[in-house]
Amino acid sequence: MDLMMPNDSMFLFIESREHPMHVGGLSLFEPPQGAGPEFVREFTERLVANDEFQPMFRKHPATIGGGIARVAWAYDDDIDIDYHVRRSALPSPGRVRDLLELTSRLHTSLLDRHRPLWELHVVEGLNDGRFAMYTKMHHALIDGVSAMKLAQRTLSADPDDAEVRAIWNLPPRPRTRPPSDGSSLLDALFKMAGSVVGLAPSTLKLARAALLEQQLTLPFAAPHSMFNVKVGGARRCAAQSWSLDRIKSVKQAAGVTVNDAVLAMCAGALRYYLIERNALPDRPLIAMVPVSLRSKEDADAGGNLVGSVLCNLATHVDDPAQRIQTISASMDGNKKVLSELPQLQVLALSALNMAPLTLAGVPGFLSAVPPPFNIVISNVPGPVDPLYYGTARLDGSYPLSNIPDGQALNITLVNNAGNLDFGLVGCRRSVPHLQRLLAHLESSLKDLEQAVGI
């Protein structure tokens, strides 16, 4: 039995029926040419034949001290693989829409805390011959990006590699840490203390830049929207892929970044959706965007320099060309100021953006206080080249996040071998007809292509 880290325990304490705290992913695979009707069954049999489990896939919350829960891990020595790995088939006609409906139900249900906190579902029956895998793991075990990287380690660049690796028995990667001594620890403590002391001046600097340059977006400048409400327990998931070349063409013609073009594509789709619902705010929606703050000169320096910025999505603007330039200016202004700050201050300011969401459950808070932002839009790096799983080609990889109170819609996308794979998760009650956003994303991209002369 091991004690939990406080941040791991937090995800278990805040979880409820309305707020599942697992992360998920939906992957689509195309069997190799000539594969027979038994391919998926045989694939699943080879998958579950991996009968050794790394510690992370054996642990579940334990109760200690006569009733204290959610502070320690217990480890199962006898894993019921048939419970954790399940094979399902879609009803006829086996549309992608049917797969997404099943995925929505799977993403809604809580993981059983009496068992290790993960599930994997193999789904066949798609009318185009592909099959799917939906995986979910509790956030107390692993974060979404790490889970995606773990899943990618089961894949191979060799289309003839027939081995079916399992995420639960991959050998841990060796960790290399620099030697630690008392002086380095003291240096770290002084660095953190200096960052805390400097936080207030840094915040003033951000405010001054916003006022003088009118480029930055500060927390609580977001309007109230239909997305910033309490969420129910039911989820709806939507997923679709777009060619990265189309987005790159918009990027080049508009003179912006790929991420700017993606944000503009999302902004146009959100504008279409909100107009359709007669719910478009007069002021622009604000997105929280995780970004790399590393300069081009430091691109190969190693380490992590990641924070979050707030982006003006210009959803009140009708012209797509003007909208994408507004988004680009907003992102450039935010990243420029944040890149001048020490890393710990960047992380602290990013945490301040998220802090109000911890109060979202307080009665009346969401209606009384402007939201810090309206939506999270994340663009996650993924594989550049085609990958295969037991000779089946990875055709789509769709990340599915969780949504807290006050954030009823999440958009996460990943780069996958020349495509951008979008995964959308929404509160089933608060964001009706979520799949309409997929059509609006396509319409928005076409608008951008036309606006920049493609």
Curated annotation (Swiss-Prot):
Name of the gene: tgs2
Pathway this chain belongs to: Glycerolipid metabolism; triacylglycerol biosynthesis
Gene Ontology molecular function terms on file: diacylglycerol O-acyltransferase activity; long-chain-alcohol O-fatty-acyltransferase activity; O-acyltransferase activity
Assigned keywords, A-Z: Acyltransferase, Glycerol metabolism, Lipid biosynthesis, Lipid metabolism, Transferase
Name assigned to this protein: Probable diacyglycerol O-acyltransferase tgs2
A Gene Ontology biological process term: glycerolipid biosynthetic process
UniProt xrefs under InterPro entries: Acyl_transf_WS/DGAT, O-acyltransferase_WSD1-like, O-acyltransferase_WSD1_C, O-acyltransferase_WSD1_N
Organism taxonomic ancestry: Bacteria, Bacillati, Actinomycetota, Actinomycetes, Mycobacteriales
EC nos: 2.3.1.20, 2.3.1.75
Family the UniProt entry places it in: Belongs to the long-chain O-acyltransferase family.
Induction / repression: A possible member of the dormancy regulon. Slightly induced in response to reduced oxygen tension (hypoxia) and by low levels of nitric oxide (NO). It is hoped that this regulon will give insight into the latent, or dormant phase of infection.
PANTHER family on file: O-ACYLTRANSFERASE (WSD1-LIKE) FAMILY PROTEIN (PTHR31650), WAX ESTER SYNTHASE_DIACYLGLYCEROL ACYLTRANSFERASE 4-RELATED (PTHR31650:SF1)
Enzyme class, UniProt record, top EC level: transferase
Catalytic residues, chain numbering: H139
Pfam families xrefs: WS_DGAT_C, WS_DGAT_cat
pH dependence, entry free text: Optimum pH is 6.5-7.2.
Catalysed conversion reaction: an acyl-CoA + a 1,2-diacyl-sn-glycerol = a triacyl-sn-glycerol + CoA; a long chain fatty alcohol + a fatty acyl-CoA = a wax ester + CoA; di-(9Z)-octadecenoylglycerol + (9Z)-octadecenoyl-CoA = 1,2,3-tri-(9Z-octadecenoyl)-glycerol + CoA; hexadecan-1-ol + hexadecanoyl-CoA = hexadecanyl hexadecanoate + CoA
Function summary: Catalyzes the terminal and only committed step in triacylglycerol synthesis by using diacylglycerol and fatty acyl CoA as substrates. Required for storage lipid synthesis.
Organism: Mycobacterium tuberculosis (strain ATCC 25618 / H37Rv)
